[in-house]
Curated annotation (Swiss-Prot):
It is a multi-pass membrane protein. Residues 1-11, 77-103, 167-172, 239-246 are cytoplasmic. Disulfide bonds: none annotated. It comes from Methanothermobacter marburgensis (strain ATCC BAA-927 / DSM 2133 / JCM 14651 / NBRC 100331 / OCM 82 / Marburg) (Methanobacterium thermoautotrophicum). This is Aquaporin AqpM. Homotetramer. The lineage of its organism: Archaea, Methanobacteriati, Methanobacteriota, Methanomada group, Methanobacteria. Gene3D superfamilies: Glycerol uptake facilitator protein.
């Protein structure tokens, strides 16, 4: 049995990878779109590829980062890299309650450090112009619409995780690519609604570093990306448990 300390380090590394490459790709897209001038900080739907093409690129960046993390770290920690996934697994007794808080702390720290290191690589414009890939409801989308999108998106993510990674009947070796492509598809569809976070840690890292280095306060939106993903993950885990029960 791998020690809790080592598993938490693996969660830190996995969430670092997710935020550095995933959220970083969103920041780069906005920086390209802006031409060096700060536009609406939440509008990252128009960049080099234009509209949907940008979301496909961002989704694939997240998907590849997730797949790589799962294959590299899954045998160590399970590679949750998402507090909503950890809580979802706990809700159906697939993860011990005493380890939930340490996992979530490791995930939040990994996300914050990933966003910070991306800022050091890309420069201050990554925060002042690119927002470090922070998520927020898009113009015309209400608070509750964005939260509903996060519930639905995370429901799909979590039920996929239950089927391909948790269920012992699932074929071995496919979890990384299937989960990664699922996230890519969700981001492509929901990105222009809520930013498609699906993960409280993924949003936490950019929010914290944007506040510190760019003076941008987006925390009023944070409940969307905590409540929505957790509700979606728990509902999906309970649904899968019910559907597969005797």
């Amino acid at each position: 049995m791998v020690s809790l300390t080592k598993r938490c380090i693996a969660e830190f590394i996995g969430t670092f990878i997710l935020v550095f490459f995933g959220a970083g790709s969103a920041a780069v897209t906005l920086m390209i779109a802006s031409g060096g001038t700060s536009p609406n900080p939440f509008n990252i739907g128009i960049g080099l590829l234009g509209g949907l093409g940008d979301w496909v690129a961002i989704g694939l960046a997240f998907g590849f980062a997730i797949a790589a993390s799962i294959y590299a770290l899954g045998n160590i920690s399970g590679c949750h890299i998402n507090p909503a996934v950890t809580i979802g697994l706990w809700s159906v007794k697939k993860f011990p309650g005493r380890e939930v808080v340490p996992y979530i702390i490791a995930q939040l720290l990994g996300a914050a450090f990933g966003s910070f290191i991306f800022l050091q690589c890309a420069g201050i414009g990554a925060a002042t112009v690119g927002g470090l890939g922070a998520t927020a409801p898009f113009p015309g989308i209400s608070y509750w619409q964005a939260m509903l999108a996060e519930v639905v998106g995370t429901f799909l993510l979590m039920i996929t995780i239950m089927g391909i990674a948790v269920d012992e009947r699932a074929p071995k070796g496919f979890a990384g690519i299937i989960i990664g492509l699922t996230v890519a598809g969700i981001i492509t569809t929901l990105g222009n609604i809520s930013g498609s976070s699906l993960n409280p840690a993924r949003t936490f890292g950019p929010y914290l570093n944007d506040m510190i280095f760019a003076g941008t306060n987006l925390w009023n939106y944070y409940p969307i990306y905590v409540i929505g993903p957790i509700v979606g993950a728990v509902l999906a885990a309970l649904t899968y448990q019910y559907l597969t029960s005797e």
